[in-house]
Amino acid sequence: MRYYLTPEPDPQSDEKIADINHLYQTAQERAERGEATLSTDEMTGVQALERKHPDLPMHPGHVLRREFEYERHGTLSFIVNFDVASGRVGQISSGSTRNEADFLAHVRATVDAGPRVVQWHFVVDNLNTHQSESLVRYVAEESDLDIDLGVKGKSGILASMQARAVFLSDPTHRIVFHYTPKHASWMNQVQIWFSILSRKLLKRGIFTSVAELKAKVLAFIAYFNRTMAKPFRWIYQGKALVA
């Protein structure tokens, strides 16, 4: 089977790939200068599932056995920062939604927790909440910019998502967003960590409530940072990927 409605490539794809590759390659060097490089994204609709019947543990000659029926106790969305230089998971936010206000609150909490950081770099995808009016206003405030931002949907920097993304990507600001090419969120290193979380915890976990789900995710993050964290070895250089 093959897809046939192939989307148009991002015209800025090569530029964005080069920018993110350079960001990853220089993350540790810039960390020594007081800059932070964070790979940030949402993990949405994480289900708190409780199995109706207990697992049968593995023993010699038998794999762990699990029944397929479960009870669903709600969902959570997580916003996670993966520190590219250290390989550690930092700021994490959770809740029932993942809207513009949630993302802004997450970025604000991240920046507030690092007052000595001289410049913040966030690698994000092209979700509309990552290019919002409130985010533009916050970055302008944090960068001490006293300028006319225009009117959302009508004029100036706030006129369109594209104009807002250009502003948010300005390397002279204290907070800089680096956008992955369209349909290339795999370039965001936090996606690798999401896979680790899914394999190590979520797929085998039993959660009787969203509170227990959150507690176990936070406990796993503490365990990961203590025993497993190290920078990912990023070798992709922008060459075409062949299936």
Locate the predicted segments by residue.
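Acidic/histidine-rich, metal-coordinating catalytic segments
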Residues: 117-130, 153-155
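Short glycine-/polar-rich loops that comprise or flank the Walker A/P-loop
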Residues: 34-35, 118-119, 171-176
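C-terminal anion-handling pockets and recognition modules
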Residues: 173-179, 183-184, 191-243
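Electropositive, glycine- and tryptophan-enriched low-complexity nucleic-acid-binding patches
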Residues: 58-118
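Short catalytic/ligand-binding loop motif for oxyanion handling, primarily in non-cytosolic enzymes
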Residues: 46-48, 129-133, 186-189, 241-243
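Mobile genetic element proteins and their domesticated derivatives, centered on retroelements
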Residues: 39-41, 81, 107, 125, ...
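Charge-mixed, compositionally biased segments that are often intrinsically disordered regulatory tracts
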Residues: 1-72
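RNase H-like polynucleotidyl transferase catalytic core
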Residues: 65-70, 143-189, 206-207
